[in-house]
Amino acid sequence: MGDPREQFAATLFGLYPDFLPTQGLYLDLEGNGSGSENILSFYWPALPGARRFSWMRRSESTDISYAEIRTHIDSIGASRARWIVVYSAGQESPDERERLIGLLGQDLFPGSSWINLLHVTQQSRRIKSSIREHRNVWYARDQVRVRYSLEALEWEFGIERPVNIRSHSYRYRDLDGGCGHMEVLATAQRSMSESATEEEEQSLRDYCEADVKNMFQVAYASEQLLFTRSERRNRRVVRP
């Protein structure tokens, strides 16, 4: 298995053998992780393309409530999601799940399985080696340290973000070591206070969409790499 992406795919479906990428809800939170989140982003592949991404933002004075999220999840049909997919610290049990429970006071998806693509990356020796060798993305405060970030994984799968939705916390090889332009938490604060420019609002939306959409693209490409067309069809057959 020479292609690092193939080992990533084998690791993903080895850890989660029943996982169907088109039936997962891809989720991301932007905030401080202390019981108050600024943005929740969702990507639900069951919907037509233009409607797959949605997001919720808190106001300056009010947190996003359980009732609001429950209504939103029901409205997009994602309450039936079998898997919740994130890219999060926390190994197999992702921090993102605990942050969501901390925000809402209860588990929004009690019957769903959580998949942490960072955990998959950390378990895939070849993809980690490839990320280090390519050095497409590294941590801005440390010229040596290469993080196994979502953006680094995206590069391995041929996904390239525009510079305006690359994180200012990272430096990039194709920018000659320059940083990305997106300061997501600061931009989110300006959005909540209604002081963000129209361009900033659009970049913030595009950044949040990329975070969840690109997780789906990585998972979907992994299934394509690992299984033949007939195998993929058989995986979707409902058995008694």
List each model region and its residues.
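Beta-sheet entry/capping signal
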Residues: Q23-G24, R82-V85, E223
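N-terminal accessory regions of nucleic-acid-interacting proteins
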Residues: M1-L25
